[in-house]
């Protein structure tokens, strides 16, 4: 640390920046835990979504499950991988609380957070497009809405998008916070 002369009436700001970085690191940890819970809840909600219609016969079975649609499979996989990444990044976030001036690990987290954000966004966007079609259909291509028959399945799949889009917003905040902490170093 540089020696700086302080005139009467002035306070040193060296410890203040260190304390701000520690506060940013604590907030980073909290955001990672909340994003982890959001992605986990989204993956579990979509992965367990399924509904069979009550008028199914022995010959024809009317059933909707998440694994019938590839976009929903990708949604579950992208949320699961992001959840595992967030769990593995928590020790690094704790390390940043202890050593708030660490720089290389912050750069690594920024890059990996950005990659996971893109991965999570692509999975959530693909699932959102299918949920939109399930709710509204597409009359120009004669795709009818299935949500009048499969109400529980549609509600569960639409609800699982909430946690994923919330985690996306938190990932953006994580990237911004890490960039701010890195610039204050």
From Swiss-Prot:
The protein's topology relative to the membrane is: Multi-pass membrane protein
Q: What is this protein called?
A: Casparian strip membrane protein 1
Assembly, per entry: Homodimer and heterodimers.
> What organism is listed for this UniProt entry?
Solanum demissum
Q: Which UniProt keywords apply?
A: Cell membrane, Cell wall biogenesis/degradation, Glycoprotein, Membrane, Transmembrane, Transmembrane helix
Residues assigned to the Cytoplasmic compartment are 1-32, 95-106, 182-185
Its family? Belongs to the Casparian strip membrane proteins (CASP) family.
Q: List the disulfide bonds.
A: none
> What cellular-component terms does GO give this entry?
plasma membrane
Alphabetical list of Pfam families matching this protein: CASP_dom
Q: Which residues are glycosylated?
A: 138
* Role this protein plays: Regulates membrane-cell wall junctions and localized cell wall deposition. Required for establishment of the Casparian strip membrane domain (CSD) and the subsequent formation of Casparian strips, a cell wall modification of the root endodermis that determines an apoplastic barrier between the intraorganismal apoplasm and the extraorganismal apoplasm and prevents lateral diffusion.
- Origin organism lineage: Eukaryota, Viridiplantae, Streptophyta, Embryophyta, Tracheophyta
> Where does the protein end up?
Cell membrane
Q: Which residues lie on this side of the membrane: Extracellular?
A: 54-73, 128-160
Give the NCBIfam families listed for this entry. A_tha_TIGR01569 (TIGR01569)
């Amino acid at each position: 640390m540089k020696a700086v002369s302080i005139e009467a009436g002035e306070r040193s700001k060296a410890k203040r920046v260190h304390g701000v970085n520690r506060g940013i690191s604590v907030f980073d940890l909290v955001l990672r835990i909340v994003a982890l819970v959001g992605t986990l809840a989204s993956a579990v909600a979509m992965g367990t979504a399924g509904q069979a219609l009550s008028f199914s016969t022995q010959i024809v079975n009317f059933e909707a499950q998440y694994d019938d649609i590839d976009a929903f499979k990708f949604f579950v996989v992208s949320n699961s991988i992001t959840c595992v990444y967030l769990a593995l990044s928590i020790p690094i976030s704790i390390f940043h609380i202890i050593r708030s001036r660490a720089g290389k690990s912050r750069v690594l987290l920024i890059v990996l957070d950005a990659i996971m954000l893109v991965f999570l966004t692509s999975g959530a966007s693909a699932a959102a497009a299918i949920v939109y079609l399930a709710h509204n259909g597409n009359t120009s291509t004669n795709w009818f809405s299935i949500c009048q028959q499969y109400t529980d399945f549609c509600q569960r799949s639409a609800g699982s998008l909430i946690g994923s889009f919330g985690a996306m917003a938190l990932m953006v905040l994580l990237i911004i916070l890490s960039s701010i902490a890195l610039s204050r170093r």
